[in-house]
């Protein structure tokens, strides 16, 4: 067990490779990443046996920016017989189970990468899931409750119709979504599809049990670069009153809620109204990431907001390095003022050439 598979958006394999290499080295684990451009996944192979399992336990998954999922995997199973794919797959799981007790496993995902080529396998994967699940249950696996906070999900990751990896992820340190992708429905009354970015960000960064406490009708939000209102929509839906800052027009149905004030101003120059306590700042402006991170830092340092979600548009080259630089600069700015804070960042499914960042100031 010396390999990890990490899923990602196609085109971001090099960023995942750089990130997992960095994270592993911080734990004293060394290896190399196998990268195929636009494949939608990366294989990280550790030099020492059993270290992939350690990484899957000890690298906080919510701290990985570019990976959608992290699983410990077998060697590639090749040339599977179409008449009996299940037997060698079960045998591979049995080999893994010599090191990890699958009695606590609760779910099976038969997956592919998020590419057009791999999606041609999606129908097969869906049909293959039922017989494979039955075969694994005969081994005494997949019997735990899905709601438990320990144990594993089992994964069968097909890269071709006759080639797959088998593996597992830890329930307390993975994405619970199939293929690492949350399935969100576009609201019919939302002004733009960008609304799904903020919805996914809230689901990713804010624990469900805390959402009503941290986003509610007693709060005020500011949306910089708000037009036509995709992000404002998500705040208003949760009851916030929102100052929507943009020279462009906002959607009429948002005005109809009585929960927004349109401020036709430059997002970089806008300041919150005096005597108004702003709880949330959101920002999805197309601008250099260093300029956006400086703007967010100004809001936090001035005490203009307590919590923020914003996008950083990525450059064409050195994307991982630019992200780390921006996040480190923000952390230094806040630490120098003795502020207690938490930073999270993720390349969300609904992001493209950008990442989404969440910062919360703590008491």
From Swiss-Prot:
It comes from the Bacteria. Transmembrane segments: none annotated. Its EC number is 2.1.1.186. It is found in: Cytoplasm. It catalyses: cytidine(2498) in 23S rRNA + S-adenosyl-L-methionine = 2'-O-methylcytidine(2498) in 23S rRNA + S-adenosyl-L-homocysteine + H(+). Pfam families: FtsJ (PF01728), RlmM_FDX (PF18125), RLMM_N (PF21239). GO terms for molecular function: S-adenosylmethionine-dependent methyltransferase activity. GO terms for biological process: methylation; rRNA processing. The keyword rRNA processing applies. Gene3D superfamilies: 3.30.2300.20, 3.30.70.2810, Vaccinia Virus protein VP39. GO terms for cellular component: cytoplasm. Keywords: Cytoplasm, Methyltransferase, rRNA processing, S-adenosyl-L-methionine, Transferase. S-adenosyl-L-methionine binds at residues 194, 227-230, 246, 266, 284. The active site is at 313 (proton acceptor). Monomer. NCBIfam families: PRK11760.1. HAMAP family: 23SrRNA_methyltr_M. Catalyzes the 2'-O-methylation at nucleotide C2498 in 23S rRNA. Belongs to the class I-like SAM-binding methyltransferase superfamily. RNA methyltransferase RlmE family. RlmM subfamily. This is Ribosomal RNA large subunit methyltransferase M. The gene is rlmM.
